[in-house]
């Protein structure tokens, strides 16, 4: 039996390999989350079983009808690649306890219970076809297993439930599905500690099966990255990934005709992507496929447009090793991302003149992307004044034009005061 490491020793070993394991993820910046399961059939949020007080037997009858069309995962992966995403994360099992693979540990699954196919297997194959990294979402909370609530107070139930979870993780990560890049835990209830879940033992086993895997922070251990949900807030001193719903209402499928007005357009997606780039994070944007597995129509055009924009500007302003942005709100019509001494201004609102306040570092050049056309500018101690090119030369994909600003060194910005009376001549008084 493998010796279980102490928490400090385990975390030390994980930290030693983190940079190598996470290099691709830090460069990727943008991924697709997919929430899919028996809840999809009801179309009233992925928490429908709990929110509506469904009895287990009645919900099992719903799950028995879950038979998406073979090939649906290929639609998801194709769209993710078209959108400029670099990885995908699928809910292999959500809180309802229903597994999307042919599990021998959990017969309540898409094959044995519903007579369908191994969705996880097809998902992995689809990701590989389109050059995407593979992530598995795995809910610790379970509304179906009889020990999933008893485990909080009954040691024997806890041992059985831990064995149940561990058995499923071995099925998913033990080699049948090949190399898996991300394990995305969720909702560690009802137990409130890593000791209760046996997370040290569980995650040590996971890393033994998949040495290069990266793991999120939702098993009561910090692991590799933090996961702000429905907000774009950086985790200080840590890698982080903001997971966001597409319609700001539900992770699971909702009626498209009604969800459409609440959903993001391409500008909204790119605005989120800029925020995570500016703060050094990743964006995991969700779709909730329809009952047959097809992509909800309100997601298609915005994601495809986002992908066309990223094809033009992504290599400069999004992908790869960006640096924490030293530029804060130097303009009211756009925001920034940064790579060393090069700052990328994302212009969200077109204007006949651009003025950037507070830069102390000398600006060498401004170029219009993607072609790199030089743009004239003037710089004094308070401002950089730019005359943008005509509208027909600016971005025609999503109306978000990107300018590359190259400085002599990493730019230093003295933020403009909110009180103009503090400005004395050419001197900005703090």
Describe every region a protein language model picked out.
Residues 1-430:
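Mature catalytic domains of secreted/periplasmic carbohydrate-active enzymes
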């Amino acid at each position: 039996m493998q010796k279980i490491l102490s928490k400090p020793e385990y975390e030390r070993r994980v930290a030693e390999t983190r940079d190598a394991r996470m290099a691709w993820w830090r460069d990727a910046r943008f991924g697709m989350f997919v929430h899919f399961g028996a809840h999809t059939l009801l179309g009233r949020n992925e928490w429908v079983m709990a929110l509506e007080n469904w009895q287990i037997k009645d919900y099992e009858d719903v799950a028995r009808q879950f038979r998406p069309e073979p090939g649906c995962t290929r639609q998801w992966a194709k769209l993710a690649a078209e959108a400029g995403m670099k990885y995908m994360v699928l809910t292999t099992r959500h809180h309802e306890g229903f597994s999307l693979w042919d599990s021998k540990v959990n017969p309540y699954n898409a094959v044995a219970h519903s007579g369908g196919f191994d969705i996880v297997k097809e998902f992995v194959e689809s990701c590989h076809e389109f050059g995407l990294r593979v992530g598995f979402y795995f809910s610790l909370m379970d509304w179906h297993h009889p020990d999933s609530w008893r485990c909080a107070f009954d040691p024997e139930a806890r041992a059985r439930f831990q064995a149940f979870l561990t058995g499923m993780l071995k099925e998913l990560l033990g080699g049948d599905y090949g190399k898996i890049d991300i394990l995305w835990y969720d909702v560690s209830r009802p137990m409130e500690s890593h000791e209760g879940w046996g997370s040290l033992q569980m995650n040590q086993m996971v890393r033994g099966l998949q040495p290069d895997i990266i793991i999120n922070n939702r098993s009561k251990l910090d692991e590799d990255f933090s996961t702000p949900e429905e907000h774009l807030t950086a985790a200080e001193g840590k890698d982080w990934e903001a997971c966001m719903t597409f319609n700001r209402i539900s992770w699971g499928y909702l009626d498209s005709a009604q969800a459409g007005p609440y959903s993001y357009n391409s500008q909204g997606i790119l605005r989120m992507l800029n925020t995570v780039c500016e703060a050094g994070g990743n964006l995991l944007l969700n779709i909730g496929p329809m009952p047959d597995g097809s992509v909800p129509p309100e997601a298609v055009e915005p994601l495809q447009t986002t992908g066309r924009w990223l094809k033009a500007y992504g290599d400069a302003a999004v992908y790869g090793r960006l640096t924490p942005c030293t530029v804060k709100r130097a303009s009211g019509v756009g925001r920034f991302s940064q790579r060393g001494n090069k700052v990328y201004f994302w212009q969200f609102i077109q204007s006949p003149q651009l003025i950037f306040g507070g830069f102390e570092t000398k600006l060498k050049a401004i170029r219009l992307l993607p072609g790199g056309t030089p743009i004239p500018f003037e710089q004094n101690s308070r401002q950089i004044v730019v005359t943008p090119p005509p509208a027909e030369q600016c971005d025609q994909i999503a109306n978000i034009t990107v300018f590359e600003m190259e400085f002599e060194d990493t730019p230093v910005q003295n933020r403009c005061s909110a009180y103009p009376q503090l400005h004395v001549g050419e001197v900005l008084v703090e």
